[in-house]
Amino acid sequence: MMPGAKISCKQACIGFYVYLTLASYYYKELVFYMSFEFYRKLPTPQEIKNIYPVPERIAAKKAENDAEIRKIFTGESNKFLLIIGPCSADNEEAVLDYIKRLAVVQEKVKDKIFIIPRVYTNKPRTTGKGYKGMLHQPDPEKAPDLLQGLITIRHLFLKIMDETDFPIADEMLYPENYRYFSDILSYVAIGARSVENQQHRLVSSGMDIPVGMKNPTSGDLSIMLNSIEAAQSGHSFLYRGWDVETTGNDISHAILRGAVNQYGQCIPNYHYEDINQLYDMYIQKGFANPSVIIDTNHSNSNKQYMEQVRIAKEIMHNIKHSDKMKGFVKGLMIESYIEDGCQKIGDGVYGKSITDPCLGWDATEKLIYTIADYLE
């Protein structure tokens, strides 16, 4: 239309309709993007590492620990792994206290057992609600603060390593966050709800530490085995804004944690028959370094935390009387803290879990010595 030309009423109506349509579209897009509030830009993993570096002594000890752990998974060492600790690392003082107690026991069983403390700082939630771990809430009674969470976790990890020389295990709930702690962690677990996720599998393929794949809550072992196969293979994919390639992780392995059927009933999978079946499936797949860790809690114990003692003893008995199991079962995963059971956030009982119930210290110490007695 030429400048100064008049428009008809019909043209004006059509133009106004188009304007309203476009405005409505862009408004909807604006509302959609406004559902995300970009609160603040967080430091990159490298920036966090530069601010809170790993001292040379700790880095050397980590390398030594990693080498020994690798030998357990490749069969070069016959030491037995105990990945043990609280359901969630909720309090720095109590967690450090607990791990220092573990260090005393480790010294007494070091010829047979290699302990990796569970320092779980991310908690998957079935509905997405509730306490999500130290990453989200470094103080469980205060509002979420993810930046402070990253700093608190790194500080806790470094303090544990400095004061005990222990390696550290955590769950990889968010694959994009792994790089914040890749210079510290010595063992990573992929949870039952994450094991089917492609990004978890692909990132695991680029890690040079053991990654344990839990069976899904359904109990379908083929899903877990597919995850192990993916992790043991090389891939090209998008990660943290980079086009990356991985070579595969030959010490990715299985974790049996029990299952839940369609009626909500827990189905254990720690018995001899379950482990034997998994071994046969492993061999058929031709995976490198066949290995399994048995989780004594969760659906294996029906979350009856004291059952972990009986379950551990049964597994150790089977290992003692089966050469196949002796080479295949590399260790146990046990949920343990200072006090028995669990509590609600704010109850204030020192060293008591605020998530799943855990075995208390007295029972834990006794159980570790019992496990050592089973080992030749």
Where are the model-predicted features located?
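Internal helix-turn-beta structural module
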Residues: 337-375
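Conserved phosphate/anionic-ligand binding catalytic regions in large, soluble enzymes, centered on
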Residues: 81-91, 356
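Conserved, mostly hydrophobic/aromatic
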Residues: 85, 294, 360
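N- or domain-start disorder-to-order transition segments that initiate the globular core
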Residues: 36-74
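Active-site-facing alpha/beta catalytic cores
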Residues: 40, 99, 112-277, 298-299, ...
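Metallocofactor- and cofactor-centric catalytic cores in central/energy metabolism, strongly enriched
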Residues: 62-69, 87-90, 95-99, 106-116
